[in-house]
Amino acid sequence: MGSHTVELLLQRGFHVRCLVRHSRPDLGWVKDLPIEIARGSYYDVDSLRAASNGVDYVLHIAGVTKAKSLREYHDGNVLATKNLLEAVQNNPRLKKFTYISSLAAAGPSLDGTPLREDSPGVPITTYGVTKLEAETVCQLYGRNVPIVVLRPPAVYGPRDSDILEILRWVNKGIEPVFGTKNKRLSLLYGPELARAILEATLSERTTGETYFVSDPAVYTLTETMQIAARILGRRTLRVRFPSFLLYLIAGISELALSLSSTPATLNVEKARDLLQTHWTCSPQKFTDHTGFQNQVTLEEGLRTTLQWYKQMGWL
């Protein structure tokens, strides 16, 4: 997600400084872009203070989405956010601190009604719990720092691998169904999220607010896979994974990687996530406050994403 945002900022004429961990030798998708690099660590406040010195805006997009322990999630999502806010709170030039949270911080909708910002946060995974805790940290520092919090739903697009596995199944002619087939989703195309981040950052109206940002349309997982199958020219066969089977596979996957430093892609919490019926939210408040309108339909976004996956040899 960060690389899409960096590209948009450069297109708009901003000078961009990216914080890169000391332990990371490569720059990933931004390695060929005209940016300034600041080496540092989210666990070293002095390095964060040096990296953010003199900046007008801080966009905190990094986070831990997969980990093997509560400590790793907490350090990557809560402690990192606290340290960054501690580092920037006395910067006299700072106009906005934009924190990218997640729909996971609010949890799924229980009755199918898209969640709004005043819905109580009931996260169901450790990732969601720690993103909600990080939002609380933002609220505490919001007394001294101009902050906006964005909660995107599932994000897809070029460079993103979160939906890659499902699209690989579709490409093989298989349409997986997890639990109930009437699963409903809010989605957002990655470059559109970058545009929303910039809108939220530059608007004075957004300071002190939390927003869901998404495509206003709600899709079923079946509909999403059928659109992908049509683009790929595939006929698909539905294969159902009952809840008990998905949990069994997840448990075996966790056990198999228990001695590895690599977290399982499908673990028990991810299975719980996949089995929820309604991962939906309403972006109406964000639209009302900023005028932001999603400009990329699901079919357009999937077409571009699938084309990119093929070009990269991912599909």
What are these model-predicted stretches?
Residues 199-266, 283, 299, 303-306, ...:
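Mid/C-terminal beta-alpha module of Rossmann-like enzyme folds, strongest
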Residues 110-155, 175-179:
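Catalytic helix-loop patch of NAD(P)-dependent Rossmann-fold dehydrogenases
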Residues 43, 72-83, 125, 129-130, ...:
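Glycine-rich NAD(P)-binding loop of the Rossmann-fold in SDR/ketoreductase-type enzymes
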Residues 35-76, 106-108:
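NAD(P)H-binding glycine-rich loop region in Rossmannoid oxidoreductase-like domains
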Residues 129, 133, 160-165, 178-201, ...:
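Substrate-positioning beta->alpha
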Residues 2-3:
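N-terminal Rossmann-fold NAD(P) dinucleotide-binding loop
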Residues 19-24, 42:
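N-terminal Rossmann-fold cofactor-binding loop
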